[in-house]
Amino acid sequence: MKEIVDAYFKKYGIVNHQLDSMNSFYATPDNPNSVMQQIVDETKVSDDADPGYFVLDPAKTGGHDIRIYYGRVRENGHYVGEQTIFIGKPEIKEASGASNQITPNEARLRDLNYLAPVTLKLRIVEDGIEKGSEIIKVGDLPVMVRSKICTLSEENLDQYIEKNNGPIGLSRREKLQYVGEDPDDPGGYFIIGGSERVIVSLEDLAPNKIMVEWEDRYESKVEVSKVFSQRGGFRALTSMEKGTDGTINVSIPSVAGTVPLVILMKALGLERDVDVHDAIASVPEMEPIIYSNIEDSKNPKVLPPNGVNTTEDAISYLEKRFAAGQAKEFRDKKISQMLDHSLLPHLGDSPSDRIRKAIYLGRMARSLLELSLGIRKEDDKDHLANKRIKLAGDLMDELFRSAFQSVMKDLKYQLEKTYNRKRGIKIRPAVRQDLLTQRVLHAMSTGNWIGGRTGVSQLLDRVSNLSTISHLRRIISPLTRTQPHFEARDLHPTQWGRICPNETPEGQNCGLVKNAALLINVTQGIDPDSVMEILKGMDVREVLEESPKKGRVYLNGDFIGYHDDPRYLVSRIREERRSGRMSDEVNVRYDDNTNEVIVNSDRGRLRRPLLILKDGKTVLDRTMIERLKHGEISFEDLVKQGAIEWLDAEEEEDTYVAVYAYDIPEKCPHCNSYLYRSMVDWVNPGESEITLECGFCHQRFNVPSKLSKENTHLEIDPAMILGVVASIIPYPEHNSSPRITIASAMAKQSLGFAQSNVRIRPDTRGHLLHYPQVPLVRTRVMDYIHYDRRPAGQNFVVAVLSYEGYNIQDALVINKAAIERGLGRSTFFRTYSAEERRYPGGQEDKFEIPTHDIIGARAEEYYKNLDDSGIIFPEAYVEGSDVLIGKTSPPRFLEEGEERLGPQRRRESSVTMRPNESGYVDNVFLTVSESNSRVVKIKVRSERIPELGDKFASRHGQKGVVGLVVPQEDMPFTEDGIIPDLIFNPHSIPSRMTVGHILEMIGGKIASRTGRFIDGTIFSGEPEKSLRDALVKYGFRKSSTEVMYDGITGRRFKADIFVGVIYYQKLHHMVAGKFHARSRGPVQILTRQPTEGRSRQGGLRFGEMERDTLIAHGAAMVIKDRLLDQSDGTVLYVCGNPSCGHIAIYDRRKGTLRCPVCGNTGNIYPIETSYAFKLMRDELISLGVVMRLMLGDMK
């Protein structure tokens, strides 16, 4: 169903889920019920006021009742009234005070934060009389690039170009180019301090959902029931456990210890024993355990004299347990806080919600006992129905909620502090705007989030366009990387079509860092009250009495009532959804085992689209497909018309999905061409008989249908199970799974044409392949990610041949002439920047050529390429330590001596090239920062020509480094005179089982000969037989082998050599960026050993294993040379007094050596030792342990 997939990507972008998430978060006029507005409405500043307003302390306002309203009014469980919070367009407040709208590229160039102002409407009510309202700015929030408030959104971009007198009549792509953007950039990231950062999606357990499992306790297993109760940003774990003696106890957050279930249910208002029994029991086998727990609660030892019988008794028991010895008022407050706020907060926080909580606890106990009795299995934590995905908007929700509450609390404090009866309330000066802004920016720039999570915000990977898209679609698990977590890392059946089965890192992150599949959608959530109203209209009744025949109905994990015919209810909900009368965000499932109807409408569910089947036929028909092709209807219309529906993992348990509607015959019955799915068109979807049309001869023929009446849905395209990166691999179904995982990792490291605005991007580092090519063997998914416009590789002519041992162990032999013609050449860019900072006291940095009187000034030749302003000329050649930006700064500290009275000498603080790099100055950017100080960015380029040690990889995980560069005249050649660009070792194929590599070589050979692209899409690519027939047709052997001759001797090879054309990727692991050696250089201050690392001109570590090899050889002097002379060898003077043995010191006044302990001055000897030994001795002395050195004559 290529047309449907085309329509999907025409409607939705590749990172649409992230954009939708932030669009629903931002408070814009067209989104009055935004997440931001909901947070404002739910924010509670103090206990004496409801959410949405706060009351100033009457003691500080002269007894006046002054209320500040910032949220909407709540009526009948709904918020009504006008929107109170708004977010504007991205802007920057210049040092002059003017506010200007900015573009993402300006933010990158000037190291700015890409922020939009947030304004809040506040109403002041004094003694019941409204004094008016005021709209004030409360801070700034980061703007997601390409979201609806971004400057690049269609409406905003038109206004920006018009305001700046830009050209008219431009297309969308031309407008984006005009403002310095790549038209194919997907967006979905933020710009903080000029750096692009992405909020990576987080996988978490579903809130408000009961989970039952077995847990190990002291060599025995106990049944545990848990629920992560979440409401308004507050999350609390309530757990229930059945002991070995049958007692059921509940753990409540915020209090230590456990509470017996029956006592807690009675404290919540379920006073009668029969009500407690009915709330728990579902089968007669449970009754003995329930009765036992009820009887235990009535034991006089629990609460003298008669045990717990009433709600008052239960409250008394809780007071005795958790607030013993406190005043009555404090006890009441403590228990109310525990029952109303800490226990199951998602069910409400008022005393009227206690009965609901008691019934919910009964349901938890029922699930626990069902597990104990074997009626139900333990819940699978790795099932996607029990997971929720937190997108950028959800994570920003947590951050904004915390920051906004801080702002409101601070506003209350400031108003109480500055209140003056005569002047009245002055809100604007009391608001500290930086509080919200800095709180959010700190989290965004460091990745440290609310709740102690780290790494939530990451620097966007810009190595290639593919790596960028992959990073934006990544999903990470919060589980610790050091633990095995085997089940969590494994593929789960519910991940089919939702999570890519191949794209995951190797190592400790394997299976915990995942990527979304191609056709996915993450629900934004809808108001459960609206769903509840519809369900009530379908005869869902909220009654306490339960009949075994009635089905229990749950909405978002919360029990809402019963229905007489649960199967009918489920079919009715689906009918309403498919007809468009109910939101397509709603998913429903009937659990046959427990007779439960589970309805979900919450946010964070990962869903995928499927074609709906009725009576073994698709609802989709030919008319819909034709209208889709001509753009008359969209993918969304197919959902509204009931042809396609989005299913979450919960509802998919109720379905029977067909993978294919039909099997394709090997050959066309009319033209005898080999057929494959890309070259066959399904003419009559929606009919029982299936008619196909051949893509070669356009003749039609019938095939039997594979669909049965039991099938409920049909896959749109099985190729959509893969993620973005794995989808560009041709013929992946012919490779072993680990190779696809490796290939996915390699593709993200490949160099190519990452962004079209590369010349004006000030990235810290970047790569550009000189001649990127479109792969000859391609997949359909490349069209959706615009891979042809942003390729990352080249087509190589490859011979599979051992060559003198130089391509052993995955090494590659490469043709020198091909390199000279430009094969594999790339440019590496590095940007250096400097700013004229201003310091307290009026001092500032200055761009200039430092003169000889400047402290630390270099020799004149280092400044030879600078102009008069201290900035280097474009296209100047620079090498390691050359100055790029001449800069002087005021002294760091006050200087001592006579010079303190004279003028201060400035110090040299120029920006220089990295020591091991060289290149040409590609670009010089001059701009100003937010504080109006000058900023200079120098972009240096260096050419990277393939050399020994550079890494290349095919799209099948066959990676290798260049082992030999051979002149063309010495390379083997075919009888047609074809000289390969690359010689690949045949031993790399058998054990790795990368048959796709061989098929791509054959396909590339045919594509080169015929001028047509070969389709290698997973499950639907051109078959091997078709490729081999094409080889014969164009004069090659069926096996693709050729006669080859040795370029050195001219003799024919005894074996025929497999030759083909395959797409190779140059990876960013290059020798020029890694090679390093030193003879002398800096040492560490503490240990006096050479520094570590290339960037610090460090030495190469001579480790323990290397030392052991020299010991084995008996090379004592070599050991001394490596570990002492060339490391931290030092001379110590030691007191020779037999009773002393301390290290001597040098007496400057007398010019002699003496022992500081015994005073000896004559008997002192030099010894050669490692400085690390002296350091260890000094540290032992600091512990009060002295090490005496005993000297002896060398023998």
From Swiss-Prot:
Binds 1 Zn(2+) per subunit. The gene is rpo2. Keywords: Cytoplasm, DNA-binding, DNA-directed RNA polymerase, Metal-binding, Nucleotidyltransferase, Transcription, Transferase, Zinc. It comes from the Archaea. Residues 894-909 have a biased composition (Basic and acidic residues). Its EC number is 2.7.7.6. It is found in: Cytoplasm. InterPro entries: DNA-dir_RNA_pol_su2 (IPR015712), DNA-dir_RNAP_su2_dom (IPR007120), DNA-dir_RNAP_su2_hyb_sf (IPR037033), RNA_pol_bsu_CS (IPR007121), RNA_pol_bsu_protrusion (IPR007644), RNA_pol_Rpb2_2 (IPR007642), RNA_pol_Rpb2_2_sf (IPR037034), RNA_pol_Rpb2_3 (IPR007645). It catalyses: RNA(n) + a ribonucleoside 5'-triphosphate = RNA(n+1) + diphosphate. It comes from Thermoplasma acidophilum (strain ATCC 25905 / DSM 1728 / JCM 9062 / NBRC 15155 / AMRC-C165). Belongs to the RNA polymerase beta chain family. Zn(2+) binds at residues 1135, 1140, 1155, 1158. Its cofactor is Zn(2+). One of its GO terms (biological process) is DNA-templated transcription. DNA-dependent RNA polymerase (RNAP) catalyzes the transcription of DNA into RNA using the four ribonucleoside triphosphates as substrates. This subunit is involved in DNA promoter recognition. Disulfide bonds: none annotated. This is DNA-directed RNA polymerase subunit Rpo2. Part of the RNA polymerase complex.
